[in-house]
């Protein structure tokens, strides 16, 4: 049974919802799944002024904070981040930047990797974010898994990974589940 880590950053809960759907899909695919979040770097007094954050704070905080060194313990890692100006959030970037030692020791080489994102605007740069999130995975020598051609992609997601605009709709969640299941199936074949 493949072990999969779904790791995400979210402030308003949209990326968290996708993370949960990705995890559900991976479980459907027969994997053992952990869902964790990256450390938040925005000061609490700033976050508390965001009504979207206040609504989901307790649920967000219920997820354990991941540590970079634990990535090596999984067969597959699926990274999720909100889109910020066409790239991943600084919190996710900082977390990935802390994987330098794993890179030097080639600890993630051969592991399966995939990505997902959410943003607030239809043209906010989701595909650019997905592509930029894949670059560190390539640098680590990970085996990248995207989404195959599917009718669901006509309305939601991208070949590069799952994506949503605003609160994820049912189509978005279905594509996220497809991604999780596909990663689980590929990881199982490689284990």
From Swiss-Prot:
Residues 4-184 form the Flavodoxin-like domain. One of its GO terms (molecular function) is FMN binding. Its cofactor is FMN. Binds 1 FMN per monomer. GO terms for cellular component: membrane. It catalyses: a quinone + NADH + H(+) = a quinol + NAD(+); a quinone + NADPH + H(+) = a quinol + NADP(+). Its EC number is 1.6.5.2. FMN binds at residues 10-15, 83-85, 118-124. PROSITE patterns: FLAVODOXIN (PS00201), FLAVODOXIN_LIKE (PS50902). It holds the Pfam family Flavodoxin_1. It comes from the Archaea. Keywords: Flavoprotein, FMN, NAD, Nucleotide-binding, Oxidoreductase. It seems to function in response to environmental stress when various electron transfer chains are affected or when the environment is highly oxidizing. It reduces quinones to the hydroquinone state to prevent interaction of the semiquinone with O2 and production of superoxide. It prefers NADH over NADPH. Homodimer and homotetramer; in equilibrium. Belongs to the WrbA family. This is NAD(P)H dehydrogenase (quinone). It comes from Archaeoglobus fulgidus (strain ATCC 49558 / DSM 4304 / JCM 9628 / NBRC 100126 / VC-16). The lineage of its organism: Archaea, Methanobacteriati, Methanobacteriota, Archaeoglobi, Archaeoglobales.
């Amino acid at each position: 049974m493949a072990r999969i880590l779904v790791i995400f950053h979210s402030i308003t809960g949209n990326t968290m919802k996708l993370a949960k759907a990705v995890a559900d899909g991976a479980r459907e695919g027969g994997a053992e799944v952990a869902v964790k979040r990256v450390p938040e770097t925005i000061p609490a007094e700033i976050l508390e002024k965001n009504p979207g954050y206040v609504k989901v704070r307790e649920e967000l905080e219920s997820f354990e904070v991941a540590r970079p060194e634990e990535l090596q313990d999984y067969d597959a890692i699926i990274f999720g981040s909100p889109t910020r100006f066409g790239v991943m959030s600084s919190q996710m970037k900082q977390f990935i930047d802390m994987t330098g030692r794993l890179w030097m020791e080639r600890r993630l080489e051969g592991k399966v990797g995939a990505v997902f994102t959410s943003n607030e605007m239809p043209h906010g740069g989701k595909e650019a974010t997905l592509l930029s999130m894949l670059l560190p995975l390539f640098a680590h020598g990970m085996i990248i898994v995207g989404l195959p051609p599917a009718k669901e992609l006509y309305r939601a997601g991208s070949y590069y990974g799952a994506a949503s605009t605003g609160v994820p709709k049912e189509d978005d969640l279905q594509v996220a589940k497809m991604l999780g299941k596909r990663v689980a199936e590929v990881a199982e074949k490689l284990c």
